Amino acid sequence: MPPPEVATLLTGLAMGESPRWHQNRLWFSDWGAQEIVALDLDGNREVVVRTAFGLPFCIDWLPDGRLLVVSGRESLLLRREPDDRW
């Protein structure tokens, strides 16, 4: 069996962390840029959230689809509402 093919998906990240697959996109936190980014199957990058708080350590979703973010500096668990409020 041949080895799996390795490909670079994205460059230019400060520090990518907490990858999650959600709604057919790869989501992750870029700690250094203080962003939450989504990458689709065609390689299109979207900055979904630019955080006003500290480092977006980890992300996940509630069953109803609301985004959860752990903010490292403040030691907070934040929930993003449908109207983009935290």
Describe the residue ranges of each PLM region.
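Short loop/turn segments that connect beta-strands within beta-propeller blades
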Residues: D40-N44, R80-D84
